[in-house]
Amino acid sequence: LGTDCGSFLLVGKPVVLRQEIQRKAGKVMLCNEEMRKSILSRLQGYRYEHSLGVERAAIMLAEKYGEDPEKAGTAGILHDITKYLSPQEQLNLCGKYGIIPCTVEKSEPKMLHGKTAAAIARAEYHMPEDICDAIACHTTGKNHMTLLDKILYLADYIEETRDFPGVDKARELAQIDIDSALLYCYDQTLTELVARGKLIHSDTIAAYNDMIRQGVS
């Protein structure tokens, strides 16, 4: 299937759609030029390219599944703005914004970057709650995810710079059914975490269970 951002999501659309998506990605109305520059200045190297990739993938998923592309794209460029911070800096932001880390997050503070990024999006960029909520759960997932939550989680997993076993399958599923794609992502993530002997966040288990209860396959 490959990783052409302009064709892996929207079946039957011309590859030139990539240029249109890139044009839209640079003109998200919720995020004016000055704000966009401020956000992107916090991202470096791979994280910069990754966030732009998530923005584009989120816009495409939003257009495919009927969510607001502006909200999806904005969530995409904001989702990792605290990813570069050290574990102690993550915990400091938690203290500042009243975030109470769970036991798993205390052991793996990098998991907090979704919640701390959401806090920054809310406090510094005055983003609406649905965008902040999507950013907050983009790493772990959660029970009863909204469409915007699902789009950001999936866009983060399948964006064009991602290259790991299973990503092409996730991209294929994203063309067919967003819930099936999400369930596949959860399954892959849980399998990897178990294989590596890593802690599993309760929200990830809840997200997986929610899909199963709904009969997603």
Which stretches of residues belong to each language-model region?
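N-terminal glycine-rich anion-binding loops that anchor highly charged ligand groups
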Residues: 50
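Divalent metal-dependent catalytic cores for phosphoryl transfer on phosphate-bearing substrates
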Residues: 34-41, 59-184
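Charged phosphate-binding loop/patch that engages nucleotide di/tri-phosphates or the phosphate backbone
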Residues: 191-217
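Short, Lys/Arg-enriched N-terminal segments with co-localized hydrophobic residues
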Residues: 8-28
